[in-house]
């Protein structure tokens, strides 16, 4: 573990945005479907260490992650959940005004504009069988910074699901939000990444119970529930970590080309990382292989032929919680867009998350 916990909270927010920025490259790399082409261009630039992000913009992922963080900050200590949800809805809707040149996803754009934060239950949208994308997963990591304590697991489940289904009311979408938040909390607690996947599988029945109890489009949600769970179980079996005790096993070779194919194989429609199940999965796969190497994390999670900025935003956050800024060239984040807001969010979330405060549920 690198640095004190405050520094690692700051690194979580900043390096998530750095990953997003690097994977996006002002829109040039997110949509290149061939990872080898990206890696060739990266090598011509002098590789990761040589990149100064001064003129590189964050994408929609970071704008929405900041929206989540700043809603949590505004809700303050011991918030009541309806107010927190209204604040999340407000921040999601408002941040749509900052999407020019950031390639926002369709579901996020359309549904955020439907949210009515000032009305009771105005944060709810109907179920939609086409909303399994990664837009909920890419913005939820900081929920795990806010509610990291094991005693707050039920809260983390509820807040990640409800924040996720404000734009992605489909289990494949909002369970990605749960995975992003849960793994962040695991990182805060120093839980070995080998155990994270097993932990997620144990939490999914609790999430299902919450969906049933919430009484909102229950039948539709349960009908579409199994895909996320089955895909994750298949992945954990493939890496040999379903038991939570074993070291992950990677194929040999597993270079850029092989990883691109693997990311296609785990995807829903052929664009790796673009769904709620595979964006955190690819980020997790990269983290397991990279250990404390920022460069190795980047090569696996930021620079590939899939939805690279989303997998990068998620992986960068988890890695930052674990290792702080250890071995990261300051040029990768010093002149980052919104760096001050990101640092402030990290410090504020540390202050809020360090106390096991109760949350008022009506």
From Swiss-Prot:
EC number annotated for this UniProt entry: 3.2.2.19
Whether Hydrolase counts among this entry's keywords is yes
Q: How is the cofactor bound?
A: Binds 2 magnesium ions per subunit.
- Annotated residues that bind Mg(2+) 2 are located at 307, 309-310
What's in the keyword line of the UniProt record?
Hydrolase, Magnesium, Metal-binding
InterPro entries per UniProt: ADP-ribosylarg_hydro (IPR012108), ADP-ribosylglycohydrolase (IPR050792), Ribosyl_crysJ1 (IPR005502), Ribosyl_crysJ1_sf (IPR036705)
The organism's superkingdom is given as Eukaryota
The cofactors it requires, by name, are: Mg(2+)
Q: Which positions bind Mg(2+) 1?
A: 59-61, 309
Q: Which reaction does it catalyse?
A: N(omega)-(ADP-D-ribosyl)-L-arginyl-[protein] + H2O = ADP-D-ribose + L-arginyl-[protein]; alpha-NAD(+) + H2O = ADP-D-ribose + nicotinamide + H(+)
Query: Record-annotated residues binding substrate?
Result: 90, 129, 135
Q: Which family does it belong to?
A: Belongs to the ADP-ribosylglycohydrolase family.
- State its role: Specifically acts as an arginine mono-ADP-ribosylhydrolase by mediating the removal of mono-ADP-ribose attached to arginine residues on proteins.
The identity of this protein, by name, is: ADP-ribosylhydrolase ARH1
Q: Which organism is it from?
A: Mus musculus
């Amino acid at each position: 573990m690198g640095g004190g916990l405050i520094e690692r909270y700051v690194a979580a927010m900043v390096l998530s945005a750095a990953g997003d920025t690097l994977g996006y490259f002002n829109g040039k790399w997110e949509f290149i479907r061939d990872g080898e082409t990206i890696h060739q261009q990266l090598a011509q630039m002098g590789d990761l260490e040589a990149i100064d992000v001064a003129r590189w913009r964050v994408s929609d992922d970071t704008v929405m992650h900041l929206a989540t963080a700043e809603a949590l900050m505004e809700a303050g200590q011991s918030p009541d959940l309806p107010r927190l949800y209204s604040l999340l809805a407000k921040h999601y809707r408002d941040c749509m005004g900052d999407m020019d040149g950031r390639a926002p996803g369709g579901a996020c754009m359309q549904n955020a504009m439907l949210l009515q934060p000032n009305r009771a239950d105005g944060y709810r949208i109907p179920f939609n069988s086409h909303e399994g994308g990664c837009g909920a997963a890419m913005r939820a990591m900081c929920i795990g910074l806010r509610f990291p304590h094991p005693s707050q697991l039920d809260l983390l489940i509820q807040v990640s699901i409800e924040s996720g289904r404000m734009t992605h009311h489909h289990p494949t979408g909002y369970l990605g939000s749960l995975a992003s938040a849960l793994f962040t909390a695991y990182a805060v607690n120093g839980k070995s990444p080998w155990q994270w996947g097993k932990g997620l599988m144990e939490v999914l029945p609790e999430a299902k119970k919450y969906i049933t109890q919430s009484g909102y489009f229950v039948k539709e949600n349960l009908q579409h529930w199994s895909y996320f769970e089955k895909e994750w179980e298949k992945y954990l079996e493939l890496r040999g970590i379903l038991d939570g005790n074993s070291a992950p096993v990677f194929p040999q070779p597993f270079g850029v080309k092989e990883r691109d194919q693997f990311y296609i194989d785990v995807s829903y429609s052929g664009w790796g990382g673009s769904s709620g199940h595979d964006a955190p999965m690819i980020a997790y796969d990269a983290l397991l292989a990279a250990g404390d190497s920022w460069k190795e994390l980047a090569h696996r999670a930021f620079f590939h032929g899939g939805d690279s900025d989303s997998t990068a935003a998620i992986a960068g956050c988890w890695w930052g919680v674990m290792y702080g800024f250890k071995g990261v060239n300051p040029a990768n984040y010093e002149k980052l867009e919104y760096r001050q807001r990101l640092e402030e969010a990290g410090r504020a979330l540390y202050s809020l998350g360090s106390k096991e405060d109760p949350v008022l549920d009506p």
